[in-house]
């Protein structure tokens, strides 16, 4: 067994991620649709987060490898996608998070991305976990829809044994019958007991997998309710995807927040986060 323990506070430059500190935002778009759109979304997030004093990391995927159809849009691919993300990072001086799907991608992605993300569907794939951990990048581990919160410790142990203690756990909902996800609010506390920063992916928790026959549906109208509920538990951060016109987004539009609503949405969560973390902790054991 590894002697390493997860870092309770994960640091990325001036950004500190911990469950007791002001929340950090991993935000952006689902998949890189075009370079111009990525720049537009990044600039909008950056401007709003500066006004609201929210630490920010830009998120976008270069490839969506688990689409429902062979004909679904997947993105620009590894080479061009990493180039675009690197350009955004350099132009805006903003940290980057993106996901990795295969072991060979881990090293080149980690050269550009500050945080590399382990997809929920792939979170038990040992070769992928080990390759990602060995990059020494911060790893955002998505909780699989089919795993209980307490089972996430096994994935943490794999990363620690591969020599990486810069780990984040991210809730994104649990399978509830067919074509539905629910979020167990008690699961946040279970994962926080593992002494790692815990984030909430409110976007993908709103999915209805396979709900549109050839793609996932979503419940965008309920995003405020779910985000408030999750952030009220006291979390290290929020994962959020937005789009100027979600109904025309090339992936997961039904779950994406309209970009024009981003500032009032985040302002509410900022106020809630400050309130919750100002409460005195009660020992109810």
From Swiss-Prot:
It comes from Acinetobacter baumannii (strain AB307-0294). GO terms for biological process: keto-3-deoxy-D-manno-octulosonic acid biosynthetic process. InterPro entries: Aldolase_TIM (IPR013785), DAHP1/KDSA (IPR006218), KDO8P_synthase (IPR006269). Belongs to the KdsA family. NCBIfam families: KDO8P_synth, PRK05198.1. It is found in: Cytoplasm. Pfam families: DAHP_synth_1. GO terms for cellular component: cytoplasm. This is 2-dehydro-3-deoxyphosphooctonate aldolase. Its EC number is 2.5.1.55. The keyword ATP-binding does not apply. The lineage of its organism: Bacteria, Pseudomonadati, Pseudomonadota, Gammaproteobacteria, Moraxellales. Keywords: Cytoplasm, Lipopolysaccharide biosynthesis, Transferase. It catalyses: D-arabinose 5-phosphate + phosphoenolpyruvate + H2O = 3-deoxy-alpha-D-manno-2-octulosonate-8-phosphate + phosphate. PANTHER family: PHOSPHO-2-DEHYDRO-3-DEOXYHEPTONATE ALDOLASE.
């Amino acid at each position: 067994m590894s002697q390493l323990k997860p870092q309770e506070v994960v640091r990325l430059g001036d950004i500190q991620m911990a469950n007791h500190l002001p929340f950090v935002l991993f935000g952006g778009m689902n998949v890189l649709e075009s370079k111009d759109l990525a720049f537009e979304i990044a600039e909008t997030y950056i401007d709003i987060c500066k006004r609201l004093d929210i630490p920010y990391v830009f998120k976008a995927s270069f490839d969506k490898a688990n689409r429902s159809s062979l004909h679904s849009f997947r993105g620009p691919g590894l080479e061009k996608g990493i180039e675009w993300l690197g350009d955004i990072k350099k132009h805006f001086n903003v940290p980057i998070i993106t996901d990795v799907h295969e072991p060979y991608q881990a090293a080149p992605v980690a050269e550009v991305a500050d945080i590399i993300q382990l997809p929920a569907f792939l979170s038990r794939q040992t070769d992928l976990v080990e390759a990602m951990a060995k990059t020494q990048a911060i790893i955002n581990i998505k909780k699989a829809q089919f795993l209980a919160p307490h089972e996430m410790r096994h994935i943490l142990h794999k990363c620690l044994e591969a020599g990486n203690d810069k780990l984040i756990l991210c809730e994104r909902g649990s399978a509830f019958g067919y074509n539905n996800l629910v979020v167990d609010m008690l699961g946040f506390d279970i994962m926080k007991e593992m002494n790692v920063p815990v984030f909430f992916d409110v976007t993908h928790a709103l999915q209805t997998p396979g709900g549109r026959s050839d793609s996932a549906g979503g419940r965008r109208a309920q995003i405020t309710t779910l985000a408030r509920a999750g952030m009220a538990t006291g979390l290290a951060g929020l994962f959020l995807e937005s789009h100027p016109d979600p109904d025309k987004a090339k992936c997961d539009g039904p779950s994406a927040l309209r970009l024009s609503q981003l500032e009032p949405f985040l302002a509410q969560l900022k106020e809630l986060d400050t309130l919750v973390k100002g409460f005195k902790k009660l020992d109810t054991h």
